């Protein structure tokens, strides 16, 4: 279970607003990559927070509401399939994370600037001090919270995308390359929201 050990060491070094960041959708064939950043109050732990992939849909939704209530700030950044194809998924992921950090706002809509950033296994191009945490969503409470926010928000987008592009089962597969999704691609061809650079081995 993730702890606040990493955050505590940074708080004890004199930093206050630690933004924790994670992404979802990096490996998808369809749709944007989405990153979320979360600033939690010092020493606050939300029971049950862990890597979003290890939680049920219902539990993620419940925890998302608690994270929204207890966090100091949340930011979200997305990068479209078109941009992913132009700059590659690694750069697109970093860009989404940068957007999330720069869009951090409190409940009143005020911009909140972090003084330290913890990121799941990445580094981003901002002047703020930062650390990349390998397996961050397993180890770091704040990164796990960010993973939940990112997963919930992207899953909600997938439901909307399903309505706009009904042939691919996006509401169920979330854009990942399941067997049914690959077969639908062969039958219908790619939609404008598919990542063309990901489809070379499929089509």
UniProtKB/Swiss-Prot annotation:
Q: State where it is primarily located.
A: cytoplasm
Q: Which cofactor does it need?
A: Mn(2+); Mg(2+)
Which segments does the entry list as coiled coil?
none
GO MF entries: manganese ion binding; RNA binding; RNA-DNA hybrid ribonuclease activity
Which residues does a divalent metal cation bind?
22-23, 120
Query: Which EC class is this protein assigned?
Result: hydrolase
Looking at the record, the residues that make up the RNase H type-2 domain are 16-203
- Protein's name in the database: Ribonuclease HII
Q: Which organism is it from?
A: Alkaliphilus oremlandii (strain OhILAs) (Clostridium oremlandii (strain OhILAs))
